[in-house]
Amino acid sequence: MLRLAPTVRLLQAPLRGWAVPKAHITAKPAKTPTSPKEQAIGLSVTFLSFLLPAGWVLYHLDNYKKSSAA
């Protein structure tokens, strides 16, 4: 544990000089509320954009295995 302290200090030294700007977050309601239809479309597009490429790769995994074995 004693050897870990200098290593941690060495890794923290560059981070001390960085100034992170404060985020401007407000708690006001939205100017234009999002309808349930818009929310459903947005969630569907988001999930499909992640799931379709992953499903395509998994479906063609055998082809990848066969082509790399040559």
Curated annotation (Swiss-Prot):
Topological relation to the membrane, as annotated: Single-pass membrane protein
Topology Mitochondrial intermembrane: residue spans: 60-70
Domain of life: Eukaryota
Alphabetized UniProt keyword annotations: Membrane, Mitochondrion, Mitochondrion inner membrane, Transit peptide, Transmembrane, Transmembrane helix
Membrane-side (Mitochondrial matrix) residue stretches: 25-35
GO cellular component: mitochondrial inner membrane; mitochondrion; respiratory chain complex IV
Location of the transit peptide in the chain: 1-24
Record carries keyword Transmembrane: yes
Transmembrane intervals: 36-59
Keyword rRNA-binding (UniProt): no
Pathways per UniProt: Energy metabolism; oxidative phosphorylation
InterPro entries: Cyt_c_oxidase_su8, Cyt_c_oxidase_su8_sf
Similarity comment: Belongs to the cytochrome c oxidase VIII family.
SUBUNIT field: Component of the cytochrome c oxidase (complex IV, CIV), a multisubunit enzyme composed of 14 subunits. The complex is composed of a catalytic core of 3 subunits MT-CO1, MT-CO2 and MT-CO3, encoded in the mitochondrial DNA, and 11 supernumerary subunits COX4I1 (or COX4I2), COX5A, COX5B, COX6A2 (or COX6A1), COX6B1 (or COX6B2), COX6C, COX7A1 (or COX7A2), COX7B, COX7C, COX8B and NDUFA4, which are encoded in the nuclear genome.
Function noted in UniProt: Component of the cytochrome c oxidase, the last enzyme in the mitochondrial electron transport chain which drives oxidative phosphorylation. The respiratory chain contains 3 multisubunit complexes succinate dehydrogenase (complex II, CII), ubiquinol-cytochrome c oxidoreductase (cytochrome b-c1 complex, complex III, CIII) and cytochrome c oxidase (complex IV, CIV), that cooperate to transfer electrons derived from NADH and succinate to molecular oxygen, creating an electrochemical gradient over the inner membrane that drives transmembrane transport and the ATP synthase.
Protein name as it appears in the record: Cytochrome c oxidase subunit 8B, mitochondrial
